[in-house]
Amino acid sequence: MDAPFAKTPSNLLIAGVDEAGRGPLAGPVITAAVILNPEIIIEGLADSKKLSLKKREELYEKIITNCKAFAIARADVEEIDRLNIFRATLLAMQRAINQLSIQPDKVLIDGHCCPDLPYETQAIVQGDQNVPAISAASILAKVTRDREMLKYDAQYPDYGFAIHKGYGTKAHLAAIHRFGITPVHRKSFEPVRQLKLFIPEE
């Protein structure tokens, strides 16, 4: 697992990009772009979904402290409902890359598709497992989104956002059917769009 992370080309500024939150029924999609410092190897980078909460938090601090540049962006629920999740994710990726304090020579994106960018771009399937900069981006995006879902949990305590982070678990679906939907639910997603009950925004 360590081999793919051993070396990074030192003559190019490579930005890795990933997202967190495409699948949930609630909350934003968060994206991150990271340009790592090739002179500082961050041990333990991996797909954020395969790391413990404690490890993600530790790596988050190491990444933002030691990288050359990073940016975190988002597409809100309203944008997801208006554009669809695919287009909203690409928009959030564009925002993250455009917010970098350093212009990259190349952008590597986890997945199958790339947003429209003025840089050389490449989509890499399972890039979060094999490309250090993408792994770093996945960690920043995941930690940022999880922290936001904790805030939603405090605002809407009946839904268990702190536990499932907005994904369609049995407990989350049961809460939706019992209490209706909140302003942070994605109204274009099933089964949310089947429901007409809205909790007024406070």
UniProtKB/Swiss-Prot annotation:
GO cellular component: cytoplasm; ribonuclease H2 complex
Xref: Pfam families: RNase_HII (PF01351)
Domain RNase H type-2: 12-201
Cysteines engaged in disulfide bonds, as pairs: none
Main location: cytoplasm
Record text on cofactor binding: Manganese or magnesium. Binds 1 divalent metal ion per monomer in the absence of substrate. May bind a second metal ion after substrate binding.
Biological process per Gene Ontology, one example term: mismatch repair
Subcellular location: Cytoplasm
Protein family per UniProt: Belongs to the RNase HII family.
NCBIfam families (UniProt xref): PRK00015.1-1, PRK00015.1-3, PRK00015.1-4
Protein name, as recorded: Ribonuclease HII
Organism whose genome encodes this protein: Coxiella burnetii (strain RSA 493 / Nine Mile phase I)
Annotated gene: rnhB
